[in-house]
Amino acid sequence: MENFQKVEKIGEGTYGVVYKAKNKLTGEVVALKKIRLDTETEGVPSTAIREISLLKELNHPNIVKLLDVIHTENKLYLVFEFLHQDLKKFMDASALTGLPLPLIKSYLFQLLQGLAFCHSHRVLHRDLKPQNLLINAEGSIKLADFGLARAFGVPVRTYTHEVVTLWYRAPEILLGCKYYSTAVDIWSLGCIFAEMVTRRALFPGDSEIDQLFRIFRTLGTPDEVVWPGVTSMPDYKPSFPKWARQDFSKVVPPLDEDGRSLLSQMLHYDPNKRISAKAALAHPFFQDVTKPVPHLRL
């Protein structure tokens, strides 16, 4: 750790404090994540170290690069490439005007490329949200914190006792499914896509049941026809209110037909029928995709 000089605290992640830091030897600016684990007394589990070490192999232009893993005295530091801003802050700063459609399209396309790459290596994210999508001034967007959920679990609260958001969580997880797939990340990205377009969260639930019911009120309460097996999921209740599905043109009014078609496939109830990242990249919505540069106020 003596090779790094902390410049400033840039945030508080799910697992610990994040600092902007400088490598004293190379001058490289990095993001330093200090991982706080409940097992501080026993040290860092070897399984976590193994999982994290595998992530150093994930090299892709749309994945935030894990440069190094430093394990000292029961503490774990992850050294990542540094990016200037996250999508949440950028959307908040652009709340009045919104993001231009070509930029939304570019961001979604890049994020799907990153997902397709990770999914092809059988790595899931499980906790995608605008806060862990990082952007730079050149128009790139990258997925951060990939694979951390598998190494450390997804806590209910962060180390500062903030509630970990449910807004982007797939219905199969909310219904208690223990064995989920890459489709959970596609669901999260679908929610983020809608949020970029409408400038507000699609399903801003404040509890697991509120989260489910918000989804049901928009997409209709799922049954065996749309989602075979749903009624036998651990947390499914026959007493759930039966809501009808809303028209997508009312859910995301600014989106054209191609955009609505892609979004509805990303938000398919049945994870087996949900579009894959690879298939989504070939969707007609991306026929005219470009890479515009965002107006960042850094």
Swiss-Prot record:
PROSITE patterns: PROTEIN_KINASE_ATP (PS00107), PROTEIN_KINASE_DOM (PS50011), PROTEIN_KINASE_ST (PS00108). Its cofactor is Mg(2+). Phosphorylation at Thr-14 or Tyr-15 inactivates the enzyme, while phosphorylation at Thr-160 activates it. Stimulated by MYC. Inactivated by CDKN1A (p21). Its EC number is 2.7.11.22. One of its GO terms (cellular component) is Y chromosome. The active site is at 127 (proton acceptor). The modification Phosphotyrosine is found at residues 15, 19. InterPro entries: CDK, Kinase-like_dom_sf, Prot_kinase_dom, Protein_kinase_ATP_BS, Ser/Thr_kinase_AS. Residues 4-286 form the Protein kinase domain. It comes from the Eukaryota. It is an enzyme of class 2 (transferase). It is found in: Cytoplasm, Cytoskeleton, Microtubule organizing center, Centrosome; Nucleus, Cajal body; Cytoplasm; Endosome. Its main location: cytoplasm. It holds the Pfam family Pkinase. Found in a complex with CABLES1, CCNA1 and CCNE1. Interacts with CABLES1. Interacts with UHRF2. Part of a complex consisting of UHRF2, CDK2 and CCNE1. Interacts with the Speedy/Ringo proteins SPDYA and SPDYC. Interaction with SPDYA promotes kinase activation via a conformation change that alleviates obstruction of the substrate-binding cleft by the T-loop. Found in a complex with both SPDYA and CDKN1B/KIP1. Binds to RB1. Binds to CDK7. This is Cyclin-dependent kinase 2. It comes from Rattus norvegicus.
